[in-house]
């Protein structure tokens, strides 16, 4: 098969979206109510990693970067994730705190996009979550200098075993280079796939203490 034939096959990959629509009359005033409903349905549908979200940031040269992390908490203050504070994304957020999140629930023909500003969590919040993690995950947080170049996986595995021995007694301490961010809720867009590519899109945009809702063309 030639490269051109393969590209033609990819170009024809598509399907109709038929799982239902989204109507203005059915929307709650608060977008978190709809988000909670959709997230619950994603969990009930047993989607793989229903809390997985893409975090998009930009560096000092306006070069965008994306990666997938797990949502760990959400409320009216924002959406929370945790990371190594020496990571690329943490440095980029420090330089430019404006970020975008995306929840891609393909099986349900849905996606949710959040736009807001990321702020560091308090040490108390981070410590509370850190000590709720499985012990091996706590140790794993100590192992990796995230985004740095390494020559082989064995370096990580050896370091993990070394630290597992070191921390075998008592609590695993919270690394000073590990923390979390809360992304404020300035805009939330809900997308529901529709037949004939007539998808339903609704944008919630915060205006003072209320939410303005607009339908967007697909």
Curated annotation (Swiss-Prot):
Sequence intervals crossing the membrane: none
Binding-site residues, substrate: 14-17, 72, 129, 133, 137, 197-199
EC number: 1.4.3.5
GO molecular function, one term: pyridoxamine phosphate oxidase activity
Keyword Endoplasmic reticulum: no
Record field: catalytic activity: pyridoxamine 5'-phosphate + O2 + H2O = pyridoxal 5'-phosphate + H2O2 + NH4(+); pyridoxine 5'-phosphate + O2 = pyridoxal 5'-phosphate + H2O2
Gene that this sequence comes from: pdxH
Record note on cofactor: Binds 1 FMN per subunit.
Domain of life: Bacteria
Entry function: Catalyzes the oxidation of either pyridoxine 5'-phosphate (PNP) or pyridoxamine 5'-phosphate (PMP) into pyridoxal 5'-phosphate (PLP).
Name of this chain's protein: Pyridoxine/pyridoxamine 5'-phosphate oxidase
Pathway: Cofactor metabolism; pyridoxal 5'-phosphate salvage; pyridoxal 5'-phosphate from pyridoxamine 5'-phosphate: step 1/1; Cofactor metabolism; pyridoxal 5'-phosphate salvage; pyridoxal 5'-phosphate from pyridoxine 5'-phosphate: step 1/1
Keywords in alphabetical order: Flavoprotein, FMN, Oxidoreductase, Pyridoxine biosynthesis
Taxonomic source organism: Shigella boydii serotype 18 (strain CDC 3083-94 / BS512)
One Gene Ontology term from the biological process aspect of the record: pyridoxine biosynthetic process
Sequence similarity: Belongs to the pyridoxamine 5'-phosphate oxidase family.
Enzyme class: oxidoreductase
């Amino acid at each position: 098969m030639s490269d051109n034939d393969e590209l033609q096959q990819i170009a024809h990959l598509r399907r109709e979206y038929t799982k239902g629509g989204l109507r203005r009359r059915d929307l709650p005033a608060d977008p978190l109510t709809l988000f909670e409903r959709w997230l619950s349905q994603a969990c009930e549908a047993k989607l793989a990693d229903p809390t997985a979200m893409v975090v998009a940031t930009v560096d000092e040269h306006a070069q965008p970067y994306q990666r997938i992390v797990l949502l760990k908490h959400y409320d009216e203050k924002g959406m929370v994730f945790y990371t190594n504070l020496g990571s690329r994304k943490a440095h980029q957020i420090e330089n430019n705190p404006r970020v975008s999140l995306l929840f891609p629930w393909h099986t349900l023909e849905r996606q949710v996009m959040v736009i807001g500003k990321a702020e560091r969590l308090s040490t108390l919040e981070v410590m509370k979550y850190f000590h709720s993690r499985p012990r091996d995950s706590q140790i794993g947080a100590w192992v990796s200098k995230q985004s740095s170049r390494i020559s082989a996986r064995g370096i990580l595995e050896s370091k993990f075993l070394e630290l597992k021995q070191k921390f075998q007694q008592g609590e695993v301490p919270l690394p000073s280079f590990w923390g979390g961010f809360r992304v404020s809720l300035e805009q939330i867009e809900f997308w529901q796939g529709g037949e004939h590519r007539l998808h339903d899109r609704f944008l919630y945009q915060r205006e003072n203490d209320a939410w303005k809702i607009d339908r967007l063309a697909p």
